[in-house]
A protein has these predicted regions:
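N-terminal cationic leader/targeting segments used for protein routing and processing
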Residues: 3-4, 17-23, 28-34, 57, ...
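Contiguous, well-ordered beta-strand patches that form the walls/edges
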Residues: 65-136
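Bacterial Sec-dependent N-terminal signal peptides
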Residues: 4-5, 15-40, 139-141, 145-158
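Sec-dependent signal peptide recognition
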Residues: 2-10
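Glycine-centered tight beta-turn/hairpin loop motif at sheet-sheet or coil-to-beta transitions
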Residues: 45-48, 114, 136, 146
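A short, sequence-level motif marking secondary-structure junctions
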Residues: 56-59, 122-125, 147-149
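A short gly/proline-enriched turn/hairpin at secondary-structure junctions
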Residues: 43-46, 62-70
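Short, solvent-exposed loop/hinge segments that bridge or flank secondary-structure elements
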Residues: 34-59
Length: 158
């Protein structure tokens, strides 16, 4: 019996060791990602302007997209930068964030000092975000990529 237990423990140890040494085939970085993508709301807060949420390297920012010449003129005046139709421009940085991705790869939680956001249904072209502010109020946002909405990005104004 001692021999059996010894072999069982040895077998489990080897299995655990081999499981920890899985080859990284690079598939984890493929597929949809909530970070590094300009996420757009379909609604225009002002004529010719679309708001953009951008998450990258632990920094959450709001950008704006100039959908028309009128929107570009408005953004140029507001940001004091030269903005043309089709440009994306930083309007204001929001805060730092941390992200916890769920195992399914299409959902997770984004935590920041200004509140918490839960995302789900992540695809290459869209994501549903439920945002909770510090007072517990919620907002549901269906966000899309510009490519999906059919608008070209002609440049990013820093």
């Amino acid at each position: 019996m001692k021999k059996f237990i010894f072999y069982a423990v040895a077998l489990l140890s080897v299995a655990s060791l081999l499981n920890g040494c899985k080859k990284d085939d690079g598939n984890e970085s493929k597929g949809p990602n909530v970070e590094g993508v300009f996420w757009f709301e379909e609604e225009e807060p002002a004529p010719g302007v679309m708001m953009v949420l951008y998450l990258k390297d632990g920094n959450m920012s709001y950008y704006a997209y100039a959908k028309s010449d009128e929107g570009a003129a408005m953004l140029s005046e507001e940001t004091r930068k030269i903005v043309k139709k089709g440009n994306i421009v930083l309007t204001f940085p929001l805060s730092a964030y941390t992200i916890v991705k769920n195992e399914d790869g299409t959902s997770g939680t984004i935590n920041s000092p200004i509140g918490k956001m839960e995302y789900s249904g992540l695809t290459e072209n869209s994501v549903l975000i439920v945002a909770y502010d510090s007072e517990g109020e919620t907002a549901r946002l269906q966000l899309y990529t510009l490519e999906y909405l059919g608008f070209p990005v002609t440049g990013i104004v820093e």
